[in-house]
Amino acid sequence: MIDTVKPLRSDAQRTAAAILQAAERVLRHDPTASLEQIAAAAGVTRTTLHRRFASRQVLIAALQASAIEHFYDAFEAASPETAPPPVALHRLTVNVMRTKSNWGYALGILSEDDPAVITKRRTVLARLEVLFQRAQHDGLIAPDVNLDWAQRMYRAMVDEAVKDLEPAVSPQGVADTRANEAELDRLATLILRTLLSGIG
């Protein structure tokens, strides 16, 4: 179950964020890694980690909650209800690929039965549906195309593209976990050109 947490001071927020980013890197490389390894990767002591996350279960729950928020923010930043559909589709594709690449471990272990996951999933899928409806209305998608099918194809293409973006990071986070922005832009353009040329 993913719980909400109390707001933190800015310095505490930075520390918590560093720990969560380190947890993503370390656990992606080794899901059995210890809290000591995560603390070391974050550049904090085990005591500091425990002060913020009392147990491994609490840390994992916070990591999942953070990943969900990043995924939701990826949709929010694309303005799917208001931006011109071509712009929103490109923004959304880049944002979602970036989030899936940077938070792949946490997103991969989300429980499909968690109410928070269910709610956020329904919300983002509804927003994606609105965007595809707008794209069809504007002529980007042919009027006889089934939008449910089109969205499934889109999501499958994004997931395939992300596989090539997965960063090979060491537990110490030596490699940069951020996907290359130019490559994200290239892949988003390729995905949308391929998709829309088939259903447009």
PLM-predicted stretches and their roles:
Residues M1-D3, R122, A126, V130-D138, ...:
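C-terminal peripheral helix-coil segments that are non-catalytic and often amphipathic
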Residues A18, Q37, V58, V87-R91, ...:
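Amphipathic alpha-helical interaction segments
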Residues A78, G104-S111, A161-G173:
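Secondary-structure edge/capping motif, primarily at the C-terminal ends of alpha-helices
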Residues A62, E69, D73-S101, E112-R121, ...:
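Hydrophobic alpha-helical connector segments
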Residues G43-F53:
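Short hydrophobic/aromatic patch on the recognition helix
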Residues M1-H29, A33-A41, V58-A61, S66:
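Basic, helix-initiating cap at the start of DNA-binding domains
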Residues V26, H70, V96-W103, L131, ...:
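A short secondary-structure junction motif
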